A protein has these predicted regions:
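PLP-dependent amino-acid enzyme catalytic core
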Residues: 1-205
């Protein structure tokens, strides 16, 4: 399937690191996923890769199509890298107050970055602009990270089982799961997997 299978080797299967500490004199252990080892150094690579792969499988992303997405940072970096590897033009719409380094990295990955001011609606304006671009350029794919069910599914069927299998190698199961929240895909997807079968696992965003 084009070069998507080659990219798969660069996303996921990151190490699970054991962190030992004590609390109130009692030994405790935390386990941290080292997501820096993903393709662009972010957990967002998982979601971006899965959304694009599923779009190709469903015929929604055709050869020569433009990938356009509204993002504030890491997802845009992931889409820029994966899109370029697959030979797609990538247009990223993002608020103009995001860091210079993020914008420059996307440029270096070959993406076009469209800055959106507060007067233009900021992030909500960026989302609207991707829709307007699609209306004018039909051969465009919008990942729609905020309302695409593939976002959560990526973590429910891939990240969650990966974490569970790695914990099993330490001889433990999860009592709780903590993740940062952007779109909510990571915490929702992994949480669903870890809680399947009515297991009592605390999930904290």
């Amino acid at each position: 399937m084009r070069s998507i299978d080659g990219i798969a080797a660069l996303v996921g299967q990151t190490p699970l690191l054991e962190i030992r500490y004590s609390y109130n004199g009692q030994p405790r252990r935390l386990y941290a996923k080292y997501e820096l080892l993903n393709m662009t150094g972010s957990v967002k690579d998982r979601m971006a890769f899965y959304i694009i792969r599923r779009a190709i499988e469903r015929g929604e992303l055709q050869n020569g199509a433009v990938i356009a997405e509204a993002t504030s940072g890491n997802t845009g970096i992931s889409i820029s890298a994966i899109g370029r590897a697959l030979g797609h033009r990538v247009r990223i719409y993002m608020p103009d107050w995001m860091s210079y380094e993020r914008v420059q990295l996307m440029h270096n990955l070959g993406a076009e970055v469209v800055p959106v001011s507060k007067a233009q609606g900021g992030f909500i304006g960026a989302v609207k602009m991707t829709q307007e671009y699609l209306a004018e350029n039909p051969n465009t794919f919008l990942p729609r990270q905020f309302d695409n069910p593939d976002n959560v599914e990526a973590h429910e069927i891939l990240t969650g089982p990966e974490i569970e299998a790695q914990l099993a190698q330490f001889g433990v199961a999860a009592d709780a799961f903590v993740a940062g929240v952007g779109t909510g895909g990571t915490v929702m997807g992994v949480g669903r997997h870890l809680r399947r079968g009515a297991r009592k696992v605390r999930v904290h965003p």
